[in-house]
Design a protein with these regions (language model features):
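Primarily short, surface-exposed interaction patches in extracytoplasmic proteins
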Residues: 191-224, 228-263, 278-320, 324, ...
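Low-complexity, intrinsically disordered or signal/transmembrane-proximal segments
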Residues: 3, 8-9, 24-25, 45
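Globin-like tetrapyrrole-binding proteins
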Residues: 920
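Solvent-exposed helix-loop boundary motif
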Residues: 58-150, 154-203, 207, 219-224, ...
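Short metal-coordination and nucleic-acid-contact micro-motifs, chiefly zinc-binding Cys/His arrays
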Residues: 72, 363-369
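Post-cleavage N-terminal segment of exported redox proteins
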Residues: 4, 43-63, 147-181, 270, ...
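C-terminal capping alpha-helices of c-type cytochrome domains
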Residues: 62-64, 133-156, 409-459, 464, ...
Length: 934
């Protein structure tokens, strides 16, 4: 049979698939005639694949570890591995494949035609083909498999089968390993033995024959650590102070100052906003479809928590269940914005799926989403367990709490979660289809069995909520806010009474009547607020004191609880009548003022107002205890139909989420500390210890430094999950203080570890989008470092706030930030890094960058008005890049500055020296060392 190379194959298949008719192609006398593609038999397609795969790359030696095993692991072992053995067959080693299962040997070395495995992966019958789900194996994979079998199915003799999932490194609780003691040349020994981190890094250097780069210049370290911890480059004054400090504690003093700075929380708060998928609300018009209005309260909680060094475990507990753990603490309730952000109005299943998927990825470092349709292919997590985990979150909904001084929930409020439906069932969706739930069985809340043990338990206890959590109107500030608004309404009404004399006589009298009625309405409103507040408090007292009935006096002359409820209800009816009377007066005035052609309409409105007033007056004397409690919170609509909109807030909560939060943050849990440490390490060191940052499972990549990861995780937990402690450890390590340059490094370093996964040098890191913009403002002296507050519209080009405060949502992106790889709102566990021409153009030509360059130049000049060009050049380098210019740079840039000045004069431009200096600043802003953290 003639050989067909890969290029011919690809060309053939493109034509075969893309065209409506099958290409006339002759191979050894076999002709695929020009039949319509829709009529091509599956057998014909399969035969074509078989003919091609049998000849493709036939003479090439097949490498089992590189070409065969990855395919078996990816496509086969989910059903034929350690977790599951369909038909008694395992394919995780060549020996087990040759041994076979119930149908016999899957592979017969040397005889591909008789090998069951090859027959099944090339089968054209859908019921026979393997794998049964997803796309068939690719042609080159089939060819490699066929040729490997023909070549006697050679594999390493020491190949080991998959270990049981319980033995997977990430599923075992970390224990503190002994720090390696490494013999290092005396000149380096002192530096590499002061920090435990360095012992682990140095051990890998020795194992792989790597030589660490020397410690970087103090200026470079100062810029590196300042940008890492606060996102802002050091000022020339800060840099000079550090250079002058020759004490052993100089580095530590800098770290302490940076960690104590409020800008630390803004910098690292943005990192966690990436991981936890922060997104402002988006929708259509005023309709919220995803996330929540005022979700910025959660963002501010993140920044505040990071600045105060709140334990990471405590942060997780508050985000998942502050409403159950701290139901009366509005400050902590902000944290549940994490769950409120998952809101999706159109589909509750999508809402909960994203809650599960991203909680697992961010907090556990595991991927659970595929288990909604079938058992997990790699980790011991079944479809049933997926829906049991969903049951943990099933009852929660969202409401917005009133904040002091604001009655309008559209203007402000704290979005938080609560368990709205305590008995809502969870059913398994057959093959993940929400339209096909299995209602024969209710899923009870549970956590994955493979992460549970006698020590690590998931125990649910129902939570009895305090009355203020059930009736937010009882909060003192809520009553105060309502009263203040009513009192302002009264003052406004009194002022209106005094201004009616300016109208014509007839209208003036009617206007006075309207103003007086409005005053009565305002006074009735205040009276109603007081009456309802009294009744609310009485009912609260009744619920707090067992044995007190509704008609039991609380004092010898005190009104009964029933009396207060009746009074509150009557006050509401009086308020309704007062408003109706005011409306009637306004209708009378409108009739007098109406034009001739509008008289009939005005008369109709007056008649309607008279009817409403009569109804309201009649209702005043009705006997009823039903009144509207003072509103202290507003429920978010649950779905597009807004069902259950008026349901009262429950008096208890299921306790499911607080049980989950406690289980998750148990110090013995194997995953959360490791996952957090990996994220923090990556953002300092430029690459993670576990490359698959959201997948620590069996399909993820193992850690490059497993002992270091475990040591850091244990250290993290034993120091109260303190992020500041971890930061200090990392940034004061010798590994962190290395040069990022490979200049002078042995050739073996780059040949053995080209990607620097063993940290023989520091990794240079490109600034994130927010840090680029913030530093332009910072260098210009224009940055507003104010903490917190509502999100800034993306089109507000006048704002100089830090970039994390811009609106960030599916619909709205700040254009400058988007240019520099801003965070993806759908998920962003690790920022992308791109280098594209548009970035340089943005720094060179955008109005924002141009304006900041001018202000940077002006600021430097103002600090030293009589500075020479050489002095200006040196100060500019130190200000923007934190380094002194080299002799070569000094000469080159001085010449450039001179030429730009002369060119500006030739073109008769105003202020040529200033223009040239501004251009010099812009040049340095486009320097790679500005946008790179070295």
């Amino acid at each position: 049979m003639a050989q067909i190379d890969s290029r011919q194959y690809r060309s053939l298949m493109r034509r075969f698939i893309a065209r409506r008719f099958v290409v006339h192609q002759r191979m050894r006398g076999f002709v695929c005639s020009a039949l319509p593609a829709r009529n091509v038999l599956p057998e014909l397609q399969g035969l074509l694949l078989l003919l091609l795969s049998s000849t493709l790359f036939a003479d090439e030696h097949v490498n089992y570890n590189r070409q065969i095993k990855p395919v078996l692991i990816e496509r086969c072992v989910a059903c034929h591995g350690v977790l599951k053995q369909e038909g008694g067959l395992r394919l995780d080693t060549a020996v087990l494949a040759i041994k076979g299962g119930e149908s016999g040997a899957a592979i017969i070395p040397g005889d591909s035609g008789a090998s069951l495995l090859l027959n099944r992966v090339t089968a054209t019958d859908g019921s026979e083909r393997m794998p049964p789900e997803g796309e068939p194996l690719k042609l080159d994979q089939i060819a490699a498999l066929r040729n490997w079998i023909t070549q006697k199915a050679e594999a390493p003799v020491d190949e080991q089968p998959q270990r049981h999932p319980r033995d997977h490194w990430a599923f075992r609780s970390p224990t503190r390993p002994v720090v390696p003691q490494i013999e290092i040349p005396s000149a380096e020994q002192a530096r590499w033995q002061q920090n435990p981190i360095d012992g682990f890094i140095a051990a890998e250097h020795r194992t792989h024959g790597l030589v660490a780069q020397p410690e970087t210049d103090k200026r470079v370290w100062m810029r590196r650590v300042s940008l890492d911890l606060t996102g802002l480059s050091p000022t020339p004054e800060e840099l000079a102070a550090f250079l002058a400090d020759e004490s052993p504690e100089a580095h530590n003093r800098v770290v302490t100052r940076l960690l104590d700075s409020p800008q630390y929380g803004q910098r690292w708060g943005r990192h966690w906003m990436d991981i936890w998928r922060y997104s402002d609300w988006w929708g259509l018009g005023a309709e919220v479809r995803n996330s929540q209005k005022h979700i910025w309260h959660w963002r501010d909680w993140i920044v505040d928590s990071v600045n105060s060094d709140k334990g990471y475990d405590q942060m997780l507990r508050e985000m998942l269940a502050a409403d159950e753990l701290y139901p009366n603490d509005l400050d902590r309730l902000r944290a549940t914005g994490y769950l409120a952000r998952q809101y999706f109005i159109f589909n509750r299943t999508t809402w909960l799926d994203e809650t599960i998927e991203h909680s697992a990825k961010a907090m556990l470092g595991l991927t659970f989403n595929c288990a909604k349709c079938h058992d997990h292919k790699y980790d011991p997590f079944s479809q049933v367990e997926y829906y049991r985990l969903r049951a943990v979150f099933e009852p929660y909904q969202i409401r917005t709490e009133m904040v002091p001084g604001e009655l309008d929930f559209e203007r402000d409020g704290i979005p938080r979660v609560f368990d709205a439906h305590l008995d809502v069932p969870t059913h398994l969706h057959v093959r993940g289809d929400e339209q096909n739930p299995d209602k024969s069985c209710t899923m009870h809340p549970e956590v994955p069995a493979f992460l549970s043990s006698d020590e690590l338990k998931f125990e649910i206890e129902s939570v009895i909520l305090p009355t203020e959590a059930t009736n937010p109107g009882l909060r003192e500030f809520v009553v105060t806010t309502h009263r203040q608004a009513a009192e302002q309404q009264i003052e406004a009404a009194r002022s209106a009474v005094k201004t009616t004399g300016l109208l014509p006589a007839e209208q003036a009298q009617l206007a006075l009547t309207v103003a007086e009625k409005a005053l009565l309405t305002a006074e009735a409103h205040l009276a109603s607020i007081d009456a309802r507040a009294f009744a609310d408090r009485a009912r609260h007292l009744q619920s707090a004191l067992s044995g007190v009935s509704t008609d039991n006096n609380l004092g010898s002359n005190a009104p009964t609880i029933q009396d207060l409820a009746i009074a509150a209800a009557k006050s509401e009816r009086i308020l309704t009548a007062a408003r109706a009377d005011e409306d009637r007066a306004r209708a009378e005035l409108a009739l007098v003022q109406a034009a001739a052609d509008k008289k009939a309409e005005a008369e109709q409105k007056l008649a309607t107002a008279n009817t409403a007033l009569g109804t309201a007056k009649t209702a005043i004397d009705m006997s009823s205890e039903e009144y509207t409690p003072l509103p202290g919170a507003k429920k978010t609509q649950e779905d597009y139909q807004n069902r259950n909109a008026s349901a009262p807030f429950p008096t208890t909560s299921t306790g499911r989420r607080s049980a989950f939060a406690k289980w998750l943050t148990d110090p013995r849990h194997p995953l959360p500390a490791r996952v957090a440490v990996n994220h923090i390490w990556m953002r300092h060191m430029g690459r993670p210890l576990v490359p698959t940052v959201f997948d620590f499972g069996r399909n993820g990549t193992p850690p490059t430094h497993p002992e270091l990861l475990d040591w850091l995780a244990v250290e993290f937990v034993e120091h109260n999950w303190s992020m500041k402690h971890l930061h200090r450890l990392i940034v004061t390590s010798q590994a962190y203080r290395q040069s990022s340059s490979n200049a002078g490094a042995p050739d073996a370093n780059t040949s053995v570890d080209h990607d620097n996964k063993f940290y023989w040098r520091m990794n240079p890191i490109r600034m994130e989008a927010q840090i680029v913009r913030d530093n332009l403002l910072h260098l210009a002296g224009e940055l507003d470092v104010t903490l917190g507050g509502p999100s800034i519209p993306v089109n507000d080009e006048t704002s100089h706030r830090r970039s994390l405060y811009f609106v960030h949502s599916h619909n709205d992106h700040q254009k400058f930030l988007s240019m520099f790889d801003d965070a993806n709102v759908l998920d962003c566990y690790r920022r992308g890094e791109s280098i594209v021409p548009q970035q340089a153009l943005a720094l060179e030509n955008s109005p924002f960058a141009t304006e900041m360059a001018g202000k940077i130049a002006a600021r430097i000049a103002a600090a030293a008005p009589s500075a020479s060009d050489a002095e200006f050049l040196r100060t500019t380098f130190v200000t923007i890049l934190s380094v002194e210019p080299t002799a070569e740079e000094q000469v080159t840039m001085s010449e450039l500055l001179h030429r730009m000045t002369e060119l500006a004069r030739i073109k008769d431009r105003p202020n040529p020296e200033i223009l040239a200096r501004t251009n010099l600043v812009q040049t340095l802003l486009n320097h790679n060392d500005f946008i790179t953290i070295r």
